[in-house]
């Protein structure tokens, strides 16, 4: 098989998963570089880069790159493609060529996003792209239009979602019920359903924005009978499910890692875990306006969105305590994936607690658009999603490559990263409570201390990213082969060896169901 046939025209779920992982890693480094520019600007009062426009272009690009080109490609595209067919005993994905197209839509989409930063003044709108700031007066030129066209990544996600839903429902062995599939498979299924239902609404919203900018429509312009609040509703009806799309596959991975390294044959409360994820997926669609408490909604509307948002804490709590129950009484192996998983449980819970604070509409009036919100979502993303990715990466790296990571360096990497992200984001809670607003490139001197500490933390995190690159290089360089994975009876993805052959389950697996 030629290089081009294997990697450009690939129809193999393992190869496409590998492409997603490489692309996501590359994008993650780009996103990290952007975040360091942000923290460099904020390390001391005064300007470093120039005006607020260039700063906001960097902030916007940082968000888009991390969400659409790092977390989603790695979790759903990388781990999802690699593991879902192996875990359900399918020969491949349901639509292998569409799978390839889903991947190859991402690099052009990424180029469109980068192009938006290089023309005119760039798209300094924030990732929410609210009009009128994103309209053709405040942002004349092609920047925002190019940023809108990077919705191509959304097309990729919709195609991927269709593929995963079809694969998971239709390509299991007949004897296997949906309630016998591993939790990671469930998490990807629910994530795919969320993508399929939410992305078209975003498409509608940004298409209206595109026509407002270029074809003189007035969907979001009061002068023509439109309403900018309509855009916020459309955007957040996608935007809130999106944050659950980012974390749900992480929940699935953490369930596998915790059970494996606690020496358990299954996670505690399988059905509770499944229904908790289903509940989170459902509730994620009916809380979107908690992002909009500052736009003057009726008191009864605010009361509803406050209480509905708090209800999400219940299924989330079920998951957290089920992970703790899985750990309980186990023989814990303190391997790097376990460290990441424990870090995830602890820090994700802290992020969840600040989320409960922000759910209160009255408190949110004071905290909205301050660094408290930034601290909240970076605790659940930078220490939830990213820690889950690193837990999954360190756990399944031997499966993907056949090589093992250096154990002590990987643990050291965890220590550096843990220190870095906490030093970066914990002080931001204090900044937010003291009223420092988001999306400004400068600040009063009173905020200097915590900003300086936060920026030092970002440099430590950068060191961790460089360490990770070195650790991966070292693994391929040293070529320590995997001898024998443990617990293969309950972890079907390992049964073909490390790495598995190019084609697995070429004939349907025989499943014996215990009566």
UniProtKB/Swiss-Prot annotation:
Residues in compartment: Mitochondrial intermembrane: 42-51, 119-141, 213-227, 287-298, 358-370, 434-446
An example Gene Ontology molecular-function term: heme binding
Domain of life, per lineage: Eukaryota
Reactions mediated catalytically: 4 Fe(II)-[cytochrome c] + O2 + 8 H(+)(in) = 4 Fe(III)-[cytochrome c] + 2 H2O + 4 H(+)(out)
Cofactor(s) annotated in UniProt: heme; Cu cation
Swiss-Prot/TrEMBL GO biological process terms: aerobic respiration; oxidative phosphorylation; respiratory electron transport chain
Topology Mitochondrial matrix: residue spans: 1-12, 88-95, 171-182, 262-269, 328-335, 401-406, 479-515
Subunit (UniProt): Component of the cytochrome c oxidase (complex IV, CIV), a multisubunit enzyme composed of 14 subunits. The complex is composed of a catalytic core of 3 subunits MT-CO1, MT-CO2 and MT-CO3, encoded in the mitochondrial DNA, and 11 supernumerary subunits COX4I, COX5A, COX5B, COX6A, COX6B, COX6C, COX7A, COX7B, COX7C, COX8 and NDUFA4, which are encoded in the nuclear genome.
Protein name: Cytochrome c oxidase subunit 1
Organism: Gallus gallus
